[in-house]
């Protein structure tokens, strides 16, 4: 039994200012108070029931040892020399050993003993760590300088051994010694638990507002512009691939274009650039195969006018972009100012599964690609290109696909999580989204021309409802947007675009209806001036043009303004009005109220 006492003089490893020291005259005075209340059989049974057999044995040994009077304790010969050796090697801790070993540990153990039935299993294991060290000397690493000891059969001797200081530090660092202010009270047995971190915080952490992550942006890619698609980004993306977004067929999504905050020096001829938003297949695919897929899709549409990509007639488009043009069935272009952020709403009318005649085939991923050109040079100078993958579903399929990916992600993370956190997962799952927007990835390939689809139909239908805007600078520039016609078979060659007449380029289409009507009438202004408006009203309502003498415009704020040529020239196509025709002294007064 002498080995159990060998470690008592070296329990205090260093003079740590964080440990509260207690002073006591000697060990017997400290233990005399505890011997007045010896351990009862009920206390021992309770401790054993909680699995603390080591604690019962250790406390029993200490009680038996201090019951013997000090003068009757036997200390073996040779122990004193070794104790002196330890004291000389640890002289800096000499004044603290007695106070720490006798008072601090014994008071700490006694507190644990008196409230054992109130502690949890984890607390008990921490409380008796020091006793475990006493009863299991093999846990300490002995140096080659350890001296032999002569044990005693009846009593524990105060012999000491030399141990590595680092081993002692490692062993006793976890021992928790509460300060007087932190000592637990009988009416408050358990400490207040610290809040546990959310088990899925690595999943739910929102991504930073920046461009695509650095791991898949090529270092030499142009980062002068940033394009975002306001649709949640897919969770599972293969390494090195462009980000992917899930979209619904026929639903309009905003696309934002802006200049990067830290913009490189781009030598533009003006502040305006021309961007082409297109839906294309991977540029690495054979262009003939791409055109075959577009033709297959177009042949299955209910009308020949069905386009792949549409632009919404939202006011946000008119405020930030201009000269919106449908250059192909799968592409549209517009002009915007690099000093302002541009926003345009696009909708897609195809599904990822529309390009195969077989049912049950996995959908083909498409690319949403944005090419930006210097406006003054037409499409001769490509300055930026970015892409992202898109998969198009029907009937809210994009939302279902996102929910499926979320469940898989939580299931994968939940395998290592505690079952007690089901409430946390259930509360977070419904509203979770990987990312609210999808950033388009800049690419370095600025040479490959995208394949644009223009079917063999009347090309005046390319401009919807009379929307005739400025075309590309010339025919050679238009052809540079797609692969040269020499690379296509004769049957797949796209014919040149129809040239617009100067008369068509000035037409403006307005929608008007009366207060009592529910359906709008279309007014086609052959010339964007007051004369053209009077002529259109006269033809539509069969009124003599000479009887129309006043034309007013009533703003939403109620302001009545005389209509003139400047106001009409600034009208965009498809603007809607309420038409009021009033007879005044045999003449007609026209009032257009904004909606």
Curated annotation (Swiss-Prot):
Q: Where in the cell is it found?
A: Nucleus
Start and end residues of each stretch annotated as Disordered: 484-505
Report what the protein is called.
Answer: Grainyhead-like protein 3 homolog
Biological process terms from the Gene Ontology for this record are: regulation of transcription by RNA polymerase II
**Designated gene of the protein:** grhl3
Q: What is its main location?
A: nucleus
Q: What is the recorded function of this protein according to its Swiss-Prot or TrEMBL entry? A: Transcription factor playing important roles in primary neurulation and in the differentiation of stratified epithelia of both ectodermal and endodermal origin. Binds directly to the consensus DNA sequence 5'-AACCGGTT-3' acting as an activator and repressor on distinct target genes.
Q: Name one Pfam family in it.
A: GRHL1_C
Q: Any extra remark in the record?
A: GRHL genes (GRHL1, GRHL2 and GRHL3) show a paradoxal lack of redundancy despite their extensive sequence identity in the DNA-binding and protein dimerization domains and the fact that the core consensus DNA binding sites are identical. They have related but remarkably different functions during embryogenesis because of their differential spatiotemporal expression patterns during development.
Whether Nucleus counts among this entry's keywords is yes
InterPro entries (alphabetical): CP2, TF_CP2-like
Q: Where is this region: Transcription activation?
A: 29-92
Start and end residues of each Grh/CP2 DB domain: 221-454
Gene Ontology cellular component? nucleus
Q: Which UniProt keyword terms apply here?
A: DNA-binding, Nucleus, Transcription, Transcription regulation
Look up the coiled coil feature and give its residue ranges. Answer: none
GO MF annotation: an example: DNA-binding transcription activator activity, RNA polymerase II-specific
């Amino acid at each position: 039994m002498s080995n159990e006492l060998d470690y008592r003089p070296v329990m205090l490893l260093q003079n740590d200012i964080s440990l509260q020291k207690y002073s006591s005259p000697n060990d017997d005075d400290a233990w005399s108070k505890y011997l007045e209340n010896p351990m009862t059989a009920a206390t021992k049974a309770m401790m054993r029931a909680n699995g603390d057999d080591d604690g019962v044995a250790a406390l029993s040994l200490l009680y038996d040892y201090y019951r013997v009077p000090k003068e009757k304790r036997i200390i073996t010969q040779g122990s004193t020399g070794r104790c002196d050796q330890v004291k000389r090697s640890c002289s800096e801790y000499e004044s603290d050993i007695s106070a720490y070993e006798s008072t601090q540990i014994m008071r700490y153990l006694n507190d644990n003993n008196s409230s054992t039935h109130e502690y949890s299993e984890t607390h008990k294991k921490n409380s008796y760590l020091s006793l475990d060290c006493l009863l299991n000397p093999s846990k300490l690493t002995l140096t080659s300088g350890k001296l032999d000891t002569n044990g005693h059969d009846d009593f524990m001797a105060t012999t000491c051994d030399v141990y590595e200081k680092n081993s002692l530090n490692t062993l006793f660092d976890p021992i928790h010694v509460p300060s007087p202010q932190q000592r637990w009270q009988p009416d408050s047995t358990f400490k207040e638990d610290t809040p546990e971190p959310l088990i899925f915080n690595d999943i739910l952490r929102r991504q930073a507002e920046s461009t695509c992550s650095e791991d898949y942006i090529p270092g030499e890619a142009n980062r002068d512009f940033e394009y975002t698609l306001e649709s949640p980004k897919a969770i599972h993306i293969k390494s090195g691939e462009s980000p992917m977004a899930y979209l619904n067929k026929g639903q309009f999504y905003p696309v934002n274009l802006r200049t990067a905050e830290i913009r490189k020096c781009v030598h533009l001829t003006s502040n305006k650039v021309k961007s082409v938003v297109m839906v294309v297949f991977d540029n690495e695919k054979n262009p003939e195969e791409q055109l075959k897929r577009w033709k297959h899709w177009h042949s299955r549409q209910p009308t020949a006018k069905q386009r792949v990509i549409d632009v919404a007639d939202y006011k946000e488009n008119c405020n930030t972009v201009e000269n919106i043009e449908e250059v192909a069935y799968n592409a549209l272009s517009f002009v915007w100012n690099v000093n302002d952020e541009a926003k345009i709403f696009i909708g897609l009318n195809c599904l990822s599964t529309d390009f195969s005649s077989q049912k049950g085939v996995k959908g083909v991923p498409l690319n949403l690609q944005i090419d930006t050109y210097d406006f003054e040079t037409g499409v001769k100078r490509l300055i930026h290109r970015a892409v992202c993958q898109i998969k198009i579903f029907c009937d809210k399929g994009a939302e279902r696909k996102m929910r499926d990916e979320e469940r898989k992600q939580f299931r994968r993370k939940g395998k290592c999580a505690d079952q007690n956190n089901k409430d946390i997962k259930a509360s977070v799952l419904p509203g979770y989204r990987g990312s609210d927007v999808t950033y388009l990835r800049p690419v370095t390939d600025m040479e490959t021309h995208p394949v644009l689809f223009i079917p063999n139909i009347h090309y005046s239908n390319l401009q919807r409802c009379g929307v005739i805007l400025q075309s590309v600078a010339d025919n050679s520039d238009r052809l540079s947007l797609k692969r040269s016609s020499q690379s296509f078979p004769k049957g797949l060659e796209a014919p040149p675009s129809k040239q617009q007449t100067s008369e068509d380029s000035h037409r403006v289409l307005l929608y008007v209806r009366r207060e009592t009507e529910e359906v709008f009438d279309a007014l086609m202004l052959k010339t964007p001036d007051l004369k053209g408006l009077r002529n259109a009203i006269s033809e539509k309502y069969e009124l003599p043009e000479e009887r129309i003498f006043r034309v007013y415009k009533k703003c939403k704020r109620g302001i009545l303004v005389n209509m003139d040529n400047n106001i009409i020239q600034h009208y965009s196509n498809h603007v809607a009005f309420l038409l009021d025709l009033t007879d005044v002294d045999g003449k007609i007064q026209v009032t257009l109220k904004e909606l």
